[in-house]
Amino acid sequence: MQRTVSSRMELDLRGESDLVFSMAVAAESSLSSERMSFVIDGTAFEAQELVDRHGSRLHQFAAGPGSMLVEYSATVDGRADAAPADDLDPIIYLRPSRYCESDSLLPTARYEFAGLSGHDLLTAVTLWVWDRLSYVPGSSLVTDGASRTLMARRGVCRDYAHLVIALLRALDVPARMVAVYAPGLSPMDFHAVAEANIDGQWWVVDATRLAPRQSMLRISTGRDAADIAFLTNHRADLILNRLEVLAIVDELPTDDSQQLVQLG
C-alpha cells in the first residue's frame, strides 16, 4: 500500500505568535519522501520538531506578524506496526476529558449497552452513534463536547469521535482520539476517528463511515480534540484564510464496518 498526503495552510498573523503545527504523519510511518516548509512574507523559517509518547510530531516556532504559508507533503510505503499499548494508557484513556464527558454519559451508556463487551460492544457503540447523528458540516462549535453532540444529534467527524470515546470510557473501555489523513474522504479534510483498547490492542473506530479505515494514516493521538489540533496559537490573533488537504492511496480498500481494523 502506498499513500500520498499533503496539506497547505495560508494564514495572516496579526502579531508575535507562538505556533504549533500538527500536520506531519506520525513518527512510526514508513516514509519514502517528506517535505515541510514554513514561509512568512517570502522568508523561510525552520521549526523545532517535538515527538510525544505516541509518535505525534509537533512543529513549534515563534513568528512575527505577516502572511504565512505552510506546506507539507509525504509518501508512505506499506503499513506501520500496530500502535503498542502500555500500562499508562488505561489510566489516561478511561478518565473523562474536556470534550469526552464520560461521567455525564454513564447512565446513557449503561442503559443502551447493558450486557455487551469486547468486539460486540465496539460494534454496537459505533452503529448507535452512526444511526443517531447526522453529519452536518458547520453544525457544531469548537467548544462542543460529547454531551452537547448527543443532544444536538448532529456534528462532524470530531463530534462523532468524541461521542464514541465518551460512551466507551463510561463502559470501562479505554478510548482515545486520532487525527488522520483519510484517502477516500469527501469532502477532503483532516479527519478525526476514535481508537478503543480491546484485549490489549488498539482498534480504530469511525462512526461517520466516510472513508475506509484500512488506508487511514495517523497524524496525532490524544485524549480528545484538545490534544490533536492541527494548529495551536498563543499570544497574537491569526486568521486561517485557506486550508487544503489531500490524501490518496494506490488502491482504495473496501471497509466492512463489522470488522476490527488497526491503524497502520
What are the functions of these language-model segments?
Residues 1-79:
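Intrinsically disordered, low-complexity N-terminal segments that are enriched in acidic
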Residues 13, 80, 84, 90-155, ...:
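Secondary-structure boundary elements
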Residues 21, 63, 78, 101, ...:
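Generic structural "secondary-structure junction" signal
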Residues 21, 82-88, 206:
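Short, charged, solvent-exposed linker or helix-capping segments at domain edges/interfaces
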Residues 56, 89, 145, 200, ...:
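Residue-level signal for pocket-adjacent positions within structured domains
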Residues 79-80, 203:
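Short, charged/polar, Gly/Pro-enriched secondary-structure boundary elements
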Residues 159-237:
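Hydrophobic/aromatic-rich core segments of domains that either
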Residues 264:
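Active-site/ligand-binding-proximal alpha/beta "capping" segment
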